[in-house]
Amino acid sequence: MLMPKRVKHRKVQRGRMKGRATRGNFLAYGDFGLQATTCGWITSNQIEAARIAINRYIKRGGKLWIKIFPDKPVTEKPAETRMGSGKGSPEYWVAVVKPDRVVFELSGVTEDVAREAMRLASHKLPVRTKFVTRRDFEEMGGEK
């Protein structure tokens, strides 16, 4: 499971997800990618499940990059606890994902294999996604 080794603040506020992603919104390493089209929190367990789904399908036939990292702690109070008495303890970690953020990148496989692997991974994620290729970004205006 992905989580930070150490953090400056143990508990953080929930925050808002406004606007689109301004960083991580293009393919930096691979030839194919999975791009989020809606916003949401992706937990470390969901990232791991999607990673396993991709690796099982490509069978060591390519390289996978995970472009998000769960660095936000989510707190929960124990069950049947009365209101008040402070904020709960950190239970799991999430990555905040905005629209246009590239979540996974893949190279070393054909487009058909990459498309199916990303489709399997998208079923594990709580955000809507789309399959993108390097060609898509070159047509849009050559972002890197």
From Swiss-Prot:
UniProt keyword annotation of Heme present: no
Highest taxon of source: Bacteria
One annotated GO biological process: translation
Gene3D superfamilies: Ribosomal protein L10e/L16
GO cellular component: cytosolic large ribosomal subunit
Entry annotated with the keyword rRNA-binding: yes
InterPro entries in UniProt: Ribosomal_uL16, Ribosomal_uL16_bact-type, Ribosomal_uL16_CS, Ribosomal_uL16_dom, Ribosomal_uL16_sf
Gene Ontology MF: a single term: rRNA binding
UniProtKB keywords: Ribonucleoprotein, Ribosomal protein, RNA-binding, rRNA-binding, tRNA-binding
A Pfam short name: Ribosomal_L16
Homology family: Belongs to the universal ribosomal protein uL16 family.
Subunit record text: Part of the 50S ribosomal subunit.
Role: Binds 23S rRNA and is also seen to make contacts with the A and possibly P site tRNAs.
PANTHER family listed in its UniProt record: 50S/60S RIBOSOMAL PROTEIN L16 (PTHR12220), LARGE RIBOSOMAL SUBUNIT PROTEIN UL16M (PTHR12220:SF13)
NCBIfam families: rplP_bact
Name of the protein: Large ribosomal subunit protein uL16
The species this protein was found in: Clostridium botulinum (strain Eklund 17B / Type B)
